[in-house]
UniProtKB/Swiss-Prot annotation:
This is Ribosomal RNA small subunit methyltransferase J. It is an enzyme of class 2 (transferase). PANTHER family: RIBOSOMAL RNA SMALL SUBUNIT METHYLTRANSFERASE J. S-adenosyl-L-methionine binds at E115, R116, D169. Pfam families: SAM_MT. Belongs to the methyltransferase superfamily. RsmJ family. Its EC number is 2.1.1.242. The gene is rsmJ. Keywords: Cytoplasm, Methyltransferase, rRNA processing, S-adenosyl-L-methionine, Transferase. Specifically methylates the guanosine in position 1516 of 16S rRNA.
């Protein structure tokens, strides 16, 4: 895939990632990847004031959320199916930047992320590699959070993986101006695009998951399926529709 590549400094590890995901320099591309010392960052060349995007599992935001974790306040704990000493294996079929997958892994679940877009996969892989080396979270992150680079539909149609839970967070069209995310995330969504195969993804997921399928939706969005939603958990901005397997 073609993208503008900018090096602040040479990094052998990141150069190997660029080769692995076949990311090649294009002088005319409006999207850029910045090799910023020890991290890989996506940025908008048309708006240099826009904050670059990177996967950082050691961020202050993640640290705060983990440090202040309370079962009743953490919606991902409530929808995950965790109970006593049971920690389900979760397949995140729409990994994105890995934010929710990280929280599931922090809660004690083994999580497999699937991402098909090579640029996003490179960002995730970079974040994982740095996270694995972190002294505070690396010891458990290495055993719980992993990435498969492939198309989710293709992976789910091959019954190799047998997760307890499948988690879906498909991109959804903006409803109105008030629902717009921050500008940096709007830029990221332009890269990913809308998940037109999300209904098919849910259907296939219900044939594979052992215990439940969780679909994260904006609060205003219709359910992804016309079938009955077995359980719903709501927050201020989102709704988590839980389906039973077929």
């Amino acid at each position: 895939m073609k993208i503008y590549l900018k090096f602040k400094s040479y990094n052998k590890r990141i150069c190997k990632l660029l080769q692995l995901f076949k990311l090649e320099h294009d002088q005319n591309c409006s999207m850029g990847l910045l090799i910023n010392h020890n991290s890989l960052e996506l940025y908008n060349r048309d708006n240099v004031n826009q904050k670059p995007i990177k996967v950082d599992f050691t961020s202050k935001k993640n640290h705060y959320r983990c440090h202040h974790f309370r079962r009743k306040n953490e919606v991902l704990y409530r929808v995950s199916g965790i109970k006593n000493s049971y920690f389900p294996t979760i397949l995140d079929a729409t990994a994105g930047l890995g934010n929710d997958a990280f929280i599931f892994s922090f809660l004690g679940c083994k999580v497999i992320m699937i991402e098909r877009h090579p640029i996003v996969a490179a960002l995730l892989k970079d974040g994982l590699q740095r996270g694995y080396q972190d002294k505070k979270i690396g010891h458990w992150l290495q055993t719980r959070l992993h990435l498969i680079v492939n198309d989710s539909l293709k992976m789910l149609e091959i019954p190799i993986l047998q997760p307890d839970v499948i988690y879906l967070d498909p991109m959804y069209p903006f409803h109105h101006k008030k629902s717009l995310p921050k500008k940096d995330m709007q830029f990221f969504r332009q890269l990913i695009g809308h998940n037109y195969d999300s209904k098919k993804l849910l259907e296939v997921s219900r044939k594979l998951a052992k215990n439940r399928i969780i679909v994260k939706r904006p609060y205003y969005a219709k359910p992804l399926s016309e079938d009955k939603v077995n359980h719903i958990v709501t927050t201020r901005n989102h709704r988590f529709d839980i389906y039973q397997p077929f």
